[in-house]
Amino acid sequence: MSQHDRYISPFSTRYASDEMQYIFSDDNKFRTWRRLWVALARAEMDQGLTNITPDMVAELEAHVDDINYEVAIEREKLVRHDVMSHVYAYGQQCPKAAGIIHLGATSCYVGDNTDIIVMRQGLELVRKKLVGVLAKLAHFAKEYKDMPCMAYTHCQPAQPTTVGKRATLWANELVMDLAEIDHRLATLQLRGVKGTTGTQASFMELFKGDADKIRAVDASIAKEMGFDPKAVVPVSGQTYSRKVDAFILNALAGIGQSCMKFATDLRLLANFKEMEEPFEKNQIGSSAMPYKRNPMRCERICALSRYLMVDVLNPAITAGTQWFERTLDDSANKRIAMAEGFLAADAILNILLNVSDGLVVYPKVVRARVMAELPFMASENIMMKAVKKGGDRQELHERLREHAVAAAAVVKQEGKPNDMIARVEADPAFGLTREEIEAELSPEAFTGRSAEQVTEFLRDVIQPVLDANAEDVGQHVELNV
């Protein structure tokens, strides 16, 4: 069969990066199994198991990377067990050490510990891309911190903000996601050596009841695999708690939530013609409508985010249905749900890196939309100016209300521009000239502390993140489609 006559996940062909695909590849998985077998043998030897020698450990180390997949595949056809098939294949390459591979361990020693290690690698890559996005949004927010634009509540015009201030809202949610990823990384623990039901009974047998040696084995393996020696779960059944998977996928889904919010806002702004995602020179928006400039990258962010947020249900239900010390109905679901959750998060961030690197703003449209609404928003200032010239505040308030209703009707029912200023100018109750009225129509006067908030946010929140992760700033992504 060729790649064209079988199903291949779009994550592999269209969306996810090569780096994330490798992290969840068989090669990374089975190399990690072998590294864990080396770490186990070394730790057991160091704690006094005389049947394990330095030559055996060296032999195992020499064959960590040259995996004889064909042997493992053929063996699995016979024994129907993936771990024992790879134990056999490894033993074929390491005849001296064949008899001590996997000593005292159960399948979850390699399976679960590898899952934790792989998820840590995935979280680190996600974290790197989050920082890259924050750097780009910070640059954008700084550039546009002073540009007034309409803010919307209920998707209706509210009060002016600035383009840069709105960008800080997007960035701030991603900062929250980064904190959650950091928390997951900081609290991630290996399963360690726990045996078939978590009691470590097999290791008590190996070490003649010496619990200190078992604890030392756990610490040694954790250290060799790049974890703090104390970062081993204190208790477990056969597996580490599947709540860990649920916690991690929830953190990834949080990224999906933030990115969907960003992408949805940008799709709406594209409809308003205020902002757009990058549009390539030869990009086609529609097969039927040549003029179309569809926000397809942001639409894809929304689509993948929806998938990621729904995927959260898988580990949640799995965690709740783990009977007693474990059941195997976690396995098939976990293989799909966790890997694709990471691939989805990676794909979303790839697109967001690309989009945030080339956001397009149309300043004249942005200002025109503000000016179309500003007469309504400036009504209180106009009223105060008229009162200072001798007008009656209560009468002027009612007349402004009537003018606003009439002007809104002109806009909505007749499709004409907002004529509220002309109505106020013609009303003798106000006694204001056109110049006096227009003096109150500066958008910048209505943006409050927007620009200052941007400066403070970038200085106090974003810059410390960028300073601490300088190597992750400046990422550039080319999308496959």
Region locations from a protein language model:
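Active-site-adjacent "gating/activation" loops or surface patches in catalytic cores
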Residues: 211-242
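Long, amphipathic alpha-helical stalk/connector segments used for oligomerization, subunit docking
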Residues: 307-393, 399
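A conserved active-site cap/scaffold subdomain adjacent to cofactor or substrate pockets
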Residues: 241-274, 283-344
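A helix-coil-helix interface module used to build multimeric assemblies
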Residues: 2-201, 207-222, 285-286, 296-300, ...
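Amphipathic alpha-helices that form helix-helix packing interfaces
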Residues: 40-43, 126, 130-133, 137-140, ...
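Short beta-alpha connecting loops at secondary-structure transitions
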Residues: 21-25, 71-73, 283-303, 325-340, ...
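Glycine-rich cofactor-pocket loops
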Residues: 142-164, 276-292, 325-332, 357-377
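Active/binding-pocket-proximal capping segment
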Residues: 276, 399-406
